[in-house]
Amino acid sequence: MSIKQEVFLSSGEGGIIQNNYNHSNNYNIYEHNIINEPNISVVVGRTGGGMTTVVQNIVDKIVTINNGDIEVIILTSNPKIYPNVDQCYSLSDIDLAHNYIISNPQNKKILVIDDFFKGVLRDKHTELIINHACLNLHIVLFVQCFVNFTPLIKNNLTYLFINNSVASSDIKSMYDRYLAPKINYRTFEKIMTRLETNRELSLVIVNNGLSDKLRIFESNFTLNPIYKYRCPNLQKQNKEPIDKQSRKKNIIREINDIKSKINDLSNYMDNLISELDDLFD
C-alpha cells in the first residue's frame, strides 16, 4: 500500500522534492492558500494548456468549501467557455462588476478575469485590486491578464504554476518574470519538470512567504462537477446608472485595438508571403 504524503517543500531543499516524488503519487494536497479569502490567485501556464479548466476547478473548490455562501462574477473574452455559469460577462462589463462589488462589500465574492483588452483598465478598476480585502473579494487572474496588474499587487498573492507541456525555456521564463531571485531556480525547475509527469498537480507559491514553503495543489485538467454558482445579475443590481457614452467609447476603443492587431498581422503575413515568393524565384 502506498503511503500518502503531504508535500511541503522548503525552497532550498531539492532533495526532499526528489524523495517525495519517488515514494508515491498519492498526496494529502495542501489547499489552504488557494481557498483563503480574500486573496489574489494567479494561474501561470501556456495559452491552451488547460488554464480555463484549472480556474473553473479552483472556483468550484472555493464555492464548495464555503457551502455556496459566495458569489461568482466572471469577466471573460469568451463567455461560451463557462457553460455552467448562469451569469457570465464580457470584459467590457467591468464597470458593472466594479459598481456591484463596491456597493456590496458585505457579500463574499470571487471575481475571475480571464483576459485583458488594452485600454480597459482605469483608476476606478484599480480599486478592486488594491482594496480587495476590505471588499470581501477573492480575485482569480489568468497570467495574460495579471501582467497588466502587476504594479498594483503587493500582498496576498498566490501563484499557481501549471505545467502542461511547458518547455524548459518557458520554465526559465516563468522564473525570471515572477520569482527571481526570491527562490532557488533549480528547486523551481525540478518541481515544474516533475509536474510534467503528473499534470493533475500544480505548484503553489505564496508571495508573502516565498522563502518559506512551496505547496502542491491538486488543480486537475478534468472538469469537476460544477457547484451551482450564485452569480449576481449585474445589469439589474447595479445601483449606479450606466454611462452609455463612456461604454460606447470603451467598446469602440476595444474594436479599434483588435482591428489594429489584425492589420499588423495581415501586413506581417503579406511580408512572409512575399519573402516566400522570392525564395521560389
UniProtKB/Swiss-Prot annotation:
In terms of superkingdom, the source organism counts as: Viruses
Residue spans making up a coiled coil are 242-281
Q: Which UniProt keywords apply?
A: Coiled coil
Name the chain's protein.
Uncharacterized protein L649
Q: Which organism is it from?
A: Acanthamoeba polyphaga mimivirus
